[in-house]
């Protein structure tokens, strides 16, 4: 069924509002997991590397499972998937309050909540794109701020709930808040259901010939059967012995329900051959699609700038994601007193990320700015800021660095521009899917690696030197790959809107 023309308004603004709320409710706790990370360290007494897996899984699983999430939305629709994801997120959070050990949290918080976030993000983006065309960039920009606002508010909210109700009470209350996703999801009316009449019921015997199992275009059924019989003339392939009484056939194919002859009916023989041929052609078609996909993937990696971009995004997520998870513990390790905290460091990261998305997206719209080099600049500056964290020993310096890192993390808003410049608009979806998979891998690996460095050295200094080195290395690799290709990268290929749905992924602010 074809969708109606996007209304660019009307009920679409309701979709934008509830999508904003769902992302706020869904991503608030996983993105502000750094507050819970400290409590889990005290509650379970595990190492920082092992404990960091909880937050990293919640962030990375949604990206790693993005193909499955897209398939679910395509198969069942945005509204059912949103409601189901609400159950997953709320259930995972509430289940985490009963966790007896850290391994249970890997499943309840890391996998269940993370997968729920991935499903919800895909659903909200899909239905928003259906309702908006001319104003799609604005609509997607509005819903994407839900996660950043959620990070800003939930960082302080979870800290307060832990003080008043303890860790378990905090998770129960946050999980109860997430149940509001179900109410929001119920308002996500599919676009085609607005005024499309329900299909009429048709009796099986009234079905036209076009609903037969297979009918080659331009030929009648008898000609098709002759072609099939030539391919499958062997008696061993086509003969089916009917014995021991009646055999009941599918009422959609034959009106006579039973056959009592011991000799094989000619019509059934033809139908078997027809179905066999159809299945064979379907298998060949699937194999051809798989070969085409692999061929296109190989062709993408022959582009040296794309290969460098793949390395850069992996290294960026390994090194750039840990601060949002570990910054609160960094402050505690630096003996910063809680009385000095004007605002949680994670809240600063969250609000500055929203500002960075907006300003970097505006900069990318200027024709005289090459977005590839703008993205490289954000990587290099972020790498230097990460290397400066070991020298920050006060709340003011940590807050300043948190703001810088948060602003630069907003480079997700220009990442689709970079991908478009590298591979072209026609290959954007394929290339972006590959890049996001490895971004999820980096998100999952980064915090545990930094935590392991702390367990090994009992200080975050080497850990953040390593993080900064990773991001710097990715930036310089991308810069070196792009410099000789300035002419090809500087061509003004068609650009998506600066806030298009591709820039934000299931686990990033």
Swiss-Prot record:
SUPFAM superfamilies: MFS general substrate transporter
Any one Gene Ontology cellular component term annotated for this protein: plasma membrane
Regulation: 4-guanidinobutyrate and guanidinoethyl sulfonate inhibit the transport activity.
Catalytic activities: creatine(in) = creatine(out); (R)-carnitine(in) = (R)-carnitine(out)
MF GO annotations: carnitine transmembrane transporter activity; creatine transmembrane transporter activity; monocarboxylic acid transmembrane transporter activity; symporter activity
Keywords tagged on the record: Cell membrane, Membrane, Symport, Transmembrane, Transmembrane helix, Transport
Entries under PROSITE patterns matching the protein: MFS
Membrane topology value: Multi-pass membrane protein
InterPro entries referenced in this protein's UniProt entry, alphabetically: MCT9, MFS, MFS_dom, MFS_trans_sf, Proton-linked_MCT
Ranges facing Cytoplasmic side: 1-12, 483-509
Signal peptide positions (record): none
Family that this chain belongs to: Belongs to the major facilitator superfamily. Monocarboxylate porter (TC 2.A.1.13) family.
Stated role: Extracellular pH-and Na(+)-sensitive low-affinity creatine transporter. Also functions as a pH-independent carnitine efflux transporter.
This protein's name: Monocarboxylate transporter 9
Originating species: Homo sapiens (Human)
Name of the gene: SLC16A9
């Amino acid at each position: 069924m074809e969708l109606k023309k996007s209304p660019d308004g009307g009920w679409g603004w309701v979709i934008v509002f509830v999508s904003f709320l769902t992302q706020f409710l869904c991503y608030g706790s996983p993105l502000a997991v750094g507050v819970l990370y400290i409590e889990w360290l005290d509650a379970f007494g595990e190492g920082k590397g092992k404990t960091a897996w909880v937050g990293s899984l919640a962030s990375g699983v949604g990206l790693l499972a993005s193909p499955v999430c897209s398939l679910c939305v395509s198969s069942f629709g945005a509204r059912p998937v949103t409601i189901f994801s609400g159950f997953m997120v709320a259930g995972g959070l509430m289940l985490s309050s009963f966790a007896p050990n850290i391994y249970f949290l890997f499943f309840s918080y890391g996998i269940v909540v993370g997968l729920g976030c991935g499903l919800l993000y895909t659903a909200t983006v899909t239905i928003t794109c259906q309702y908006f065309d001319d104003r799609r960039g604005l609509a997607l920009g509005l819903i994407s701020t839900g996660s950043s606002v959620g990070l800003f508010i939930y960082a302080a909210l979870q800290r307060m709930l832990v003080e008043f109700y303890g860790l378990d009470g905090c998770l129960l209350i946050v999980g109860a808040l997430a149940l509001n996703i179900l109410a929001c999801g119920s308002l996500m009316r599919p676009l085609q259901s607005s005024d499309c009449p329900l299909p009429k019921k048709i009796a099986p015997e009234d079905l036209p010939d076009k609903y037969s199992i297979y009918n080659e275009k331009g030929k009648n059924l008898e000609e098709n059967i002759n072609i099939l019989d030539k391919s499958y003339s062997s008696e061993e392939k086509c003969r089916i012995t009917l014995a021991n009484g009646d055999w009941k056939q599918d009422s959609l194919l034959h009106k006579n329900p039973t056959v009592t002859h011991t000799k094989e009916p000619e019509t059934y023989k033809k139908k078997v051959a027809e179905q066999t041929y159809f299945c064979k052609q379907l298998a060949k078609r699937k194999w051809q699609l798989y070969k085409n996909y692999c061929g296109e993937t190989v062709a993408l990696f022959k582009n040296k700038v794309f290969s460098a971009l793949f390395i850069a995004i992996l290294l960026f997520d390994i090194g750039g994601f840990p601060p949002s998870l570990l910054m609160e513990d960094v402050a505690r390790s630096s003996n910063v007193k809680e009385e000095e905290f004007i605002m949680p460091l994670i809240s600063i990261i969250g609000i500055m990320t929203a500002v960075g998305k907006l300003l970097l997206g505006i900069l990318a719209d200027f024709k005289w700015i090459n977005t590839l080099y703008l993205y490289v600049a954000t990587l290099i500056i972020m790498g230097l800021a990460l290397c400066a964290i070991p020298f920050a020993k006060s709340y003011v310096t940590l807050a300043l660095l948190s703001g810088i890192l948060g602003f630069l993390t907003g480079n997700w808003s220009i990442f689709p521009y970079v991908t478009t410049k590298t591979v072209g608009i026609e290959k954007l979806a394929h290339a972006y899917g590959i890049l996001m998979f490895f971004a999820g891998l980096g998100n999952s690996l980064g915090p545990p690696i930094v935590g392991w460095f702390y367990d090994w050295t009992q200080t975050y200094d080497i850990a953040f030197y390593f993080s900064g080195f990773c991001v710097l290395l990715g930036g310089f690799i991308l810069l070196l790959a792009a410099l000789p290709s300035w002419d090809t990268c500087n061509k003004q290929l068609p650009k998506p809107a600066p806030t298009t749905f591709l820039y934000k992924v299931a686990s990033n602010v």
